[in-house]
């Protein structure tokens, strides 16, 4: 289906096609009861049940709201930023392994603001460090490694020299939990949770049920959590690892700061919705008139086929 709109000297063409579920290599989907614990050292596995990449946009209930641009102006978007319950561990073996279960008591845990880096937030007034050490390096990774093509095969838990920061805190793990409720006017819609930035790997649970995992710390991770929700109070748990196999590709000239460092939010869409949008502008040979081609992918998450949807 193609539609052409004329606005002044700008010609806009909208092309709509159905979404074909062809996941990128490394993205897997399915019902998994629990993680194996090896996902953060498995380069062939990029994500479980994470949405395929798409343009960054938000659902709005009305054109007037959309013109305000920011997602806070949509009733179908809800921020989860703020205080989360938090536990810090110096290595994976020391983490609280069952914290995601809703009956697990986290009342004595500290609160940490999201977004933030736990290394920075943990710096005390006297200069002591409650949640590990901020580490700066240039190109290298912060864990023991060798400069060779297949070095990633050795993983991130190798024993470094004793004077390295990661000798004592081998691979820090942050356990995050908080409660939330779904607005009543979201009934019948698909609900997603989005993590805009988590360094460098995390597992996700909703109401004690394992949802999936994500790598690639600088890109948004979206998960459809509709099947895991319940009426009233819901609980989200995220287990964040400082280092993972993805860290080999994220070795930049910067401080290495683990944590949930960008916004976390919920959003909802109708069963039939735009999954992705690609806008391509162009000018004619005289640079006088312009064209804008918008390719849109629509997706139907309903159990029945939809015809002539508008």
Region spans (language model):
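Bacterial N-terminal signal peptides that target proteins for export
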Residues: 1-6
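Sec/Tat signal peptide C-region and signal peptidase I cleavage site
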Residues: 16-20
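Accessory carbohydrate-binding/adhesion or oligomerization-edge regions at the termini
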Residues: 21-155, 235-243, 266
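Accessory beta-strand-rich segments of carbohydrate-active enzymes
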Residues: 23-48, 66, 70-71, 85-89, ...
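Beta-strand-rich binding/interaction modules
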Residues: 206, 289-310
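Short beta-strand segments of immunoglobulin-like
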Residues: 278-285
């Amino acid at each position: 289906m193609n539609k052409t709109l004329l606005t002044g000297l700008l010609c806009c063409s909208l092309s709509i096609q159905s979404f074909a579920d062809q996941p990128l290599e490394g993205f897997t989907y399915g019902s998994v009861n629990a993680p194996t614990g090896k996902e953060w050292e498995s380069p062939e596995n990029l994500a479980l049940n994470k949405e395929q990449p798409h343009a960054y946009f938000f659902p709005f209930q009305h054109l007037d709201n959309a013109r305000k641009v920011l997602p806070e102006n949509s009733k179908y978007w809800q921020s989860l930023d703020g205080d989360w319950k938090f536990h810090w561990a110096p290595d994976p073996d020391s983490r609280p392994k069952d914290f995601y279960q809703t009956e697990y008591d986290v009342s004595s845990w500290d609160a940490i603001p999201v977004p933030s880096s736990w290394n920075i937030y943990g710096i005390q007034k006297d200069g002591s460090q409650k949640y590990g050490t901020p580490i700066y390096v240039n190109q290298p990774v912060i864990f023991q490694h060798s400069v060779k093509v297949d070095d990633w095969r050795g993983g991130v838990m190798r024993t470094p020299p004793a004077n390295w920061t990661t000798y004592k805190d081998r691979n820090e793990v942050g356990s995050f939990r908080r409660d939330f409720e779904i607005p009543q006017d979201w009934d019948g819609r698909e609900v997603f949770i989005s993590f805009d930035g988590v360094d460098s790997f995390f597992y996700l649970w909703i109401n004690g049920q394992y949802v999936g995992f994500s790598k690639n710390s600088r890109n948004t991770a979206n998960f459809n959590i509709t099947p895991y929700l319940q009426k009233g109070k819901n609980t989200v748990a995220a287990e964040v690892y400082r280092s993972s196999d993805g860290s080999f590709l994220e070795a930049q000239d910067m401080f290495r700061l683990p944590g949930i460092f960008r916004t976390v939010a919920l959003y909802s869409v109708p069963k039939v919705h735009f999954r992705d949008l690609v806008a391509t502008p162009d000018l004619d040979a005289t640079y006088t008139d312009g064209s804008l081609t918008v390719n849109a992918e629509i997706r139907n998450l309903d159990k029945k086929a939809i015809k002539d949807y508008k």
